[in-house]
């Protein structure tokens, strides 16, 4: 009888330890997930910034990488990538370097093609069109003979100018991950086609699929902030061996080089 009581007490003690350890682990995971969400929210608060010149007066995260007196640079990048079956992969993107010290902005509109040659080797071709930004307008700095392309560049809008994540906290069933070795972190959500940002992308781009995208938020570097690290987001509509359709966007604050 005494042996039976000791055995039962031992089992209860083991179960209690398991419950305590499980609680500690779950608390740590939930805390990490909340920290990751908060880190992304700090960047997502920038959406929308309709006037790009507002970035001249926006302060980003600063650390020891910044020299004294350096106001830093915002780097804004939006890219649409489409690869259909048996077709070349084509991306059309624009990147701007917004210098807060000189209050000037320059960058490039980039058309990129990727394909495999007859021997199966990857080939690529990049065509860059230099631009500047004045009074919230994109202006090519070199003549462009193709009127359609010139208008595409002049009318280009970055995702940060129209994207809006005010409902991000309502997104359900997010897959949050963290790799302390890099370190890197991410959050993935399945969106619906009636999502505001998805509708905005379909309004501006000819997206050849009716599939609703997944939203992937990615970051690397210290969760508390780092000018060395980066954050970006990606709307993935299709991803397989034969086809890829996705839109990516990033806003990062860096020291002046």
UniProtKB/Swiss-Prot annotation:
Its main location: membrane. The chain crosses the membrane at residues 7-27. It is found in: Cell membrane. Signal peptide: none annotated. Coiled coil: none annotated. It comes from Staphylococcus aureus (strain N315). Gene3D superfamilies: 2.50.20.40. It is a single-pass membrane protein. This is Uncharacterized protein SA2274. Belongs to the staphylococcal tandem lipoprotein family. Keywords: Cell membrane, Membrane, Transmembrane, Transmembrane helix. The keyword Transmembrane helix applies. GO terms for cellular component: plasma membrane.
